Amino acid sequence: MKKLVVLACLVLAIPNFAIQEANALDPNSVASIFDRLTSNKELANPSVIVIDEKTGEIVFEKNSTSPRKPASVLKLLTATAAYTYLQPTQRFTTSAFVGTKAKTLVIQGSLDPWISLIHTQAVKMGRTSLPRIEFSTLNALKKANNGSLRNITIYYTNLYSQDVANIQKFYFRHGVHAAMKRVTTEDAQSLSADQILSSDSPELQEILAFTLTWSDNLLAERIARLASAAAGHTSDDAGVGQTFDEVLNGLGIESKNLVTQDASGLSKLNRITAKQVGTLLIKIRENAKFAPLIGGLPIGGISGTLKDRFIKTAPQAVGLIKAKTGTLNGTSNLAGYVESGDREYAFVILADQLRKTHTAESLARNTVDRILGRIAFPILPGVIEEAPGQLGVTDQFGNQITTTN
């Protein structure tokens, strides 16, 4: 299956192109390429590490222990924490009920990170729709109380504060002053009468794959807090930081120099080293538990935040790179795996000292693409004679979705 995916990728990127059998670059050659190209001024003294996945040998490193801004590369740590402390097959259920008391309703949540504020998006992607909950509960309240909507109380459990605020705003816009009261799970059950609706999320591993593929910041933040709570810590930035430290230490990775202010990578105060990320990539590659995490990474020239990369800059690398992007103003990072024949290398490039211009960031991305293009080789003998029609690229839910990386 892996070879078929690579073949399709190459056909898409290089139609009518003769692909000769390629041998893996030996570690010395890889080191030479990185040594020469990472000195390029476009990368502005990056932090870099390359590790042979088969042997665990560090093939090349430059500033690898220098703390740098990870940007969305931090989501690798978020996903690792999720697979460490949460069940990948876990689903999140959100249900609404008419209350046992007059003029009340109950929303029983499970901290579903997948709830969507946009109904059309929710329908398209199989997400729990907050607007559906709002309209359905409003209509049920009207019916149960003969149209009277004064002095309404909404009891809820396990909802995010943002979702609670949105529900209250919805009711206010419709002329209803609803009192929102948080209760325990047990109380919510005892206060519930007839069910209005119930919605289940996909499995957590599917949500995580989407989070990594499209670099969804809100999902990353919510999932990290779920993992933090499961690890026995608080569900805030401090708790997430403790959880991330434990994840690294649990994998035998020194957590010194790790600074986290969030779980999405948006904070410019976050710090991590290329060596920490590179070692993490090797550790999760060795453990089958993390296979879905790696499967959720964007593929160069094919999917997610890498779908438009390598196609022009290094077409020979299309389909051969799985990596997490990380972009902030003045930062262009990439961390993941590159296939080189029968070898695979884990790589981390943290270029966080760029000039804060679109041109500088674009030049840095192109330079990174070309570096990896020098290393990437398929295990593909022979010649591709003719390319089939354009291949459609969608996410795992069958949708073409664009987000920031």
Residue ranges and their predicted role:
Residues I51-T55, N63-S66, G99-K101, S110-D112, ...:
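Solvent-exposed coil/turn segments that connect beta secondary-structure elements
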Residues M1-L4:
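Positively charged n-region of N-terminal signal peptides that target proteins for export
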Residues N139-G296:
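A small/polar active-site loop signature that marks catalytic segments
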Residues G56, P70-P88, T211, F347:
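Active-site SXXK
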Residues A13-P67, S136-N146:
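Beta-lactamase-like hydrolase cores
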Residues K101-R132, D194-A224:
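Conserved catalytic neighborhood of penicillin-recognizing serine enzymes
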Residues Y85-A102, A179-T184, F290-G295:
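Short, well-structured active-site flanking segments
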